[in-house]
Amino acid sequence: EMDIPGYNPVFPVPADKLEELIPLIEDARRPVIYAGGGIISAEASGELLEFAERSQIPVATTLMGIGAMPETHPLSLRWLGMHGAVFANNAVNEADLVIALGARFDDRVTGAVNMFCPESTIVHIDIDASEINKNKKVAYPIRANVKDALQVLNSALAAKGWERRSSGFTRTPEWFGVIDGWKKQYPFSYEDRKGYIAPQAVIEELYRQTADKDPIICTGVGQHQMFAAQFFKFDKPRRLATSGGLGTMGYGLPASMGACLAYPDRLVVNIDGDGSMLMNIQELATIHVERLPVKCIILNNQHLGMVVQWEDLKYDSNRAQTFLADPHDNYDPTHKTEDVIYPNYPLICAGFGVKCERVLRIEELPAAITRMIESPEAYVLDVMVPHDVHVLPMILGGMSYKDVILERIAGDGSAKKASELGKEIPTAL
């Protein structure tokens, strides 16, 4: 057993301040909970679920808070932010009461801070006093361990007779109606192009085959990271290991190794991009030597996909060192000319003693994923996907939720934005 020195702040829970929030909750007509990674750090997922079910308030998490609230729960808004759900961003920004729990109002969530939650009364509960009022001024700043704070709030609601409900919500029915409309009109979606493997379809198929296995999903950083967060639903905390704060490419492979060591009987899948995978590909040697049964899916578009997306958005699709294929070969974006695919991941993996299978066609995908899952050893799938797919929706830095991009930028700067759709998007305000 290890005894590692660390910082363990202990201070009394301000129960009086927390109980002042109960009338706010009672009076709110458009309430939303905005939950961050602090919920997971505090091991407060159970308390968050109870609070949401007692108060009947929908919950949007941050990327680092994914899994804090079961994403298949009726009260879940999935996650908000630059590439988050339209319905999550709309709900948080149009709420009259926002209860922020263990979140930091970072720019990937807020966009233009002055346009974030313009009409909302904001409560911010966080253990770190330096995070409160740092980016966004709030009406009710409360320094507390979020787990302790939620326990106080749950006890106060229980004392008032507010029972837990996992369905059949009776409070704020008009608000739930608006949110349901957003969910139906703007789900996470993608274009299914004939002859190509959509990267989102890969995540959906992985989810279909593994949802009942309670897997641990790790990612690198890039488009694949966002696709994993959008199209894999996480119902428990610490099931998604991703670098969402620093955004460190190459994180996925070593993270999956650590997960395998910590949970040797669990299915661990690293979802990676070809660029991110190359950052730490040497760890395949450790995986082989230590016999770690890491599964890895490379969404291989032979480009730095997220940077390509920004090149499309801002630089008229001019490429600057984002092309990762062999410049001496005739690049085939359909990936039908298999002998020009570079680098050769099956050959590289073979050199490390790790099984690798390349997937070129969508009809090959389900069986390939099944073989990967059922393998008792490390297994890599090199799945060829198109390089011109964008992660959508998208809110550019410094913009508001009303400026969300819903369609792919074609390179000429044209795209349909929410602000251009007018009455097509219902609003609560």
What are the language-model segments listed below?
Residues E1-D27, F188:
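Conformationally flexible catalytic loops at phosphate/diphosphate-handling active centers
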Residues E1-G6, P70-E71, V178-Y190, K236-R239, ...:
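Gly-rich Lys/Arg/Thr-decorated short loops/hinges at beta-loop-alpha junctions or inter-strand turns
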Residues P9, G65-E174, I369-I373:
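Glycine-rich, acidic loop regions that bind phosphate or pyrophosphate groups
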Residues K17-P31, F51, V92-E94, E205-P215, ...:
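Glycine-rich phosphate/diphosphate-binding loops that line cofactor/substrate pockets in enzymes
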Residues E50-Q56, T110-A129, P393-I409:
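A short, gly/pro- and small-residue-rich
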Residues I57-L63, V123-D126, V294-L299:
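Short internal beta-strands
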Residues M82, E94, N133-N135, P141-R143, ...:
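Thiamine diphosphate
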Residues F176-P254, A259:
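Active-site diphosphate/adenylate-binding microenvironment
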